[in-house]
């Protein structure tokens, strides 16, 4: 799946404008809404064992709920990036480079060349 982030941001802008929500879509409010949606996603997994959490989306209804909450998180993140002028593509690329430096992969073990 390929997501066109710019297209999604434009659609979200139009959606909010059609409902006259722009005054409420401040960085503070969007960040707070993002956290509420992330908490709703977390709630689906909250009291599950690690094994149960890995199997949650085997149930189509639960998979739908998880997907909806993930979509809410992504949509608020896109709106927050749009309102703060953060280019998410650039931010992600820079962060991946930083993470690779901060957490380098261990040297390959010749004895395990076949993989796990």
Name these PLM-found stretches.
Residues 1-116:
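Flexible "arm" and connector segments at domain edges
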């Amino acid at each position: 799946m390929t997501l066109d982030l710019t297209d999604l941001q434009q659609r979200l802008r139009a959606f909010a404008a059609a409902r006259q929500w722009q005054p409420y879509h401040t960085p503070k409010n969007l960040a707070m809404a993002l956290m509420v949606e992330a908490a709703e996603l977390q709630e689906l997994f909250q009291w599950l064992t690690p094994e149960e959490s890995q199997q949650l989306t085997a149930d189509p209804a639960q998979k739908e709920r998880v997907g909806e909450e993930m979509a809410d998180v992504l949509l608020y993140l896109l709106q927050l990036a749009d309102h703060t002028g953060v280019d998410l593509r650039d931010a992600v690329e820079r962060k991946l480079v930083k993470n690779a430096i901060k957490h380098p992969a261990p040297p390959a073990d010749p004895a395990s060349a076949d993989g796990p």
